[in-house]
């Protein structure tokens, strides 16, 4: 669903490399990237009905996010869970879901 540009934007936002003039990361950048990707997805559907879009979008964002966070923490699940704001058990379930365990 997402093109390589969107994956790159997610990566840069996750590791904090996109900054504004004030040096602050703007969540709006990620929102805009997701909006562009979903808009492109529907444009490619060419009028066909889409199903389970919510779950698809979540998995398309969640999988690379988890991958990047795990790389950033060098596989430390406790640190990764803290960064994500979830408990370690939830992180382990999500990693298993995407085959990252």
UniProtKB/Swiss-Prot annotation:
Residues 77-96 bind DNA. Keywords: Activator, DNA-binding, Transcription, Transcription regulation. It holds the Pfam family HTH_8. It comes from the Bacteria. Gene3D superfamilies: Homeodomain-like (1.10.10.60). One of its GO terms (molecular function) is DNA-binding transcription factor activity. InterPro entries: Fis_DNA-bd, Homeodomain-like_sf, HTH_Fis, Trans_regulatory_Fis. Homodimer. PANTHER family: DNA-BINDING PROTEIN FIS. Belongs to the transcriptional regulatory Fis family. Activates ribosomal RNA transcription. Plays a direct role in upstream activation of rRNA promoters. This is DNA-binding protein Fis. It comes from Shewanella halifaxensis (strain HAW-EB4). The lineage of its organism: Bacteria, Pseudomonadati, Pseudomonadota, Gammaproteobacteria, Alteromonadales.
